[in-house]
Amino acid sequence: MQFSIPMTAIRHGTALALATLLLAGCVHPITMITETAPPRSQAHLIPKKVAYVMTDADRDKEVVTPGGSGDRVSYFPYRDLEKSIRDALRAVYRDVVVLRTAGDAKANEAAGVSLVFTPRITTDSSSSSWISWPPTSFTAEVSCVVTDAAGAEITRVRAAGNGTAEFGEFKGDFGLAARRAATRLTSQLSSEIRRSEKLR
């Protein structure tokens, strides 16, 4: 037995599939990595060895947020912002190392680590453009739980950065707004750490 499908149904189905595809949009990769770092003055560094926690699982976390024209952008916030976190700490402390876990008190003490920063990162993006996909606005926020070498919480620090970029500025640099946000976040994080009496 054979069944025939009316052409109108085929056309309607094709139109629906196309509309769904257009609504879903595309996902474009960008990077948040910035080469800009806060100034590091040896004379004003706090003579402590500190660590930040960054696991392989953190580095592999991919995030997708809105772009323009119905599209979205993807990136790896922990991997991309690791340099920013390290640069912020290096602007304050004499020695900075990375740890795979925050819970190894004996290893921390043996390494001479005084403070351990465990970051949690949130991001968001948007675009005012209906004709191009790169985000024109980007927000990045990092909140760090700071513990001593034994794992006891000392305090928490938070920093955020906002970045904007217009269509005419991109010139192939599609993550420009994200990198501007990362630059501001790095500067604010180092300032917040330096401001805290508990972290000196």
Question: What is the meaning of each model-derived region?
Answer:
Residues 79-105:
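Mid-chain, structured segments of secreted extracytoplasmic proteins
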Residues 27-35, 101-154, 165:
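Surface-exposed short loop/turn segments
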Residues 26-88, 192-200:
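A structural "domain/chain start" motif
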Residues 55-60, 120-126, 160-162:
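Generic short beta-strand segments
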Residues 68-77, 147-199:
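Short secondary-structure boundary motifs at beta->alpha junctions and helix caps
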Residues 1-26:
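Sec-dependent bacterial lipoprotein signal peptides
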Residues 21, 45, 111:
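Structured loop/turn residues at beta-strand edges in well-structured enzyme cores
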